[in-house]
């Protein structure tokens, strides 16, 4: 969940979304539609779409749902017009939050997000209030067993990635958002399957959290935001010691 703890966040989100397949499919449908609208319906020429189609396959999303989402994006089928919006706010303990939303109703989305922030001890902030604490970049999390560090660095950096970070869990590849499609395509051609591939907000400064009650409040705010239908992703800059959280 913590903004800095990338792999734990992926693991936690997988556990949450596995229990809410309907919302997973809804989110994927929106993302696929937007990707097809922006870059066309051919995944061979649209790396963002290809990445999402792989996500849909891994989530066992029905092929008919995927096909409809693509055709809505290309205009072959009528559909609701969605808009991508980013909201910023502060949670308990001064933790910064960025919430990515895909919605057909900006007013509803803003009201729901504001309500959740207030309910869990935070507040919605103005644009730019917290985003300076994050790096807006492409991010790929790749299990270490799939490839060696040297081989990954060669593939990723040749494709335009800015950095490859190694940890016990695996590798994190970062790139400029404009290089995301090219890097995604290069990793795919190498046969790599990232645990996560997304345009993310990566914290450049973090807020250490050692108090169990504060950690729970931050976690609950994160989860409550994630539960909202219009919310696609939630990023935060907390640095929670996971040993203080209750066992899940």
Curated annotation (Swiss-Prot):
One Pfam short name: TACO1_YebC_N
Family annotation (SUPFAM superfamilies): YebC-like
Record bears the keyword Ribonucleoprotein: no
Gene Ontology biological process terms in this record: regulation of DNA-templated transcription
Superkingdom, taxonomy of origin: Bacteria
Keyword Transcription part of the UniProt annotation: yes
GO annotations of cellular component type: cytosol
Residue ranges of the TM segments: none
Gene Ontology molecular function, alphabetical: DNA binding
Localization annotation: Cytoplasm
Keyword field: Cytoplasm, DNA-binding, Transcription, Transcription regulation
Major subcellular location class: cytoplasm
Family: Belongs to the TACO1 family.
NCBIfam families documented for this protein: PRK00110.1 (NF001030), PRK12378.1 (NF009044), YebC/PmpR family DNA-binding transcriptional regulator (TIGR01033)
PANTHER family the record matches: TRANSCRIPTIONAL REGULATORY PROTEIN YEBC-RELATED (PTHR12532:SF6), TRANSLATIONAL ACTIVATOR OF CYTOCHROME C OXIDASE 1 (PTHR12532)
HAMAP family listed in its UniProt record: Transcrip_reg_TACO1
Protein name, entry field: Probable transcriptional regulatory protein Oter_1471
């Amino acid at each position: 969940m913590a903004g800095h703890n990338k792999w734990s966040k992926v693991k936690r989100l997988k556990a949450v979304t596995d229990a809410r397949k309907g919302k997973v499919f809804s989110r994927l449908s929106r993302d696929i539609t937007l990707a097809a609208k922006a870059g066309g319906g051919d995944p061979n020429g649209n790396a963002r779409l290809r990445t999402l189609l792989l996500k849909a396959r891994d989530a066992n999303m029905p092929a008919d749902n995927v096909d409809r989402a693509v055709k809505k994006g290309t205009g072959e089928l009528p559909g609701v017009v969605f808009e991508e919006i980013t909201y910023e706010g502060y949670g308990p303990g001064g933790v910064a939050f960025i919430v990515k939303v895909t919605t057909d109703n900006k007013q509803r989305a803003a009201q729901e997000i504001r309500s959740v922030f207030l309910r869990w001890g935070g507040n919605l902030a103005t644009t730019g209030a917290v985003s300076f604490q994050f790096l807006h970049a492409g991010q790929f999390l790749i299990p270490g067993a799939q490839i060696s560090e040297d081989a990954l660095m060669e593939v990723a950096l040749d494709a335009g990635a800015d950095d490859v970070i190694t940890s016990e869990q695996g590798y994190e590849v970062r790139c400029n958002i404009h290089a995301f499609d090219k890097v995604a395509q290069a990793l795919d051609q190498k046969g790599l399957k990232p645990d996560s591939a997304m345009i993310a907000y990566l914290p450049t400064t973090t807020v250490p959290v050692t108090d169990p009650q504060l950690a729970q409040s931050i976690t609950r705010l994160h989860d409550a935001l994630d539960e909202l239908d219009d919310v696609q992703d939630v990023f935060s800059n907390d640095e929670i010691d996971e040993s203080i959280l209750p066992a899940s």
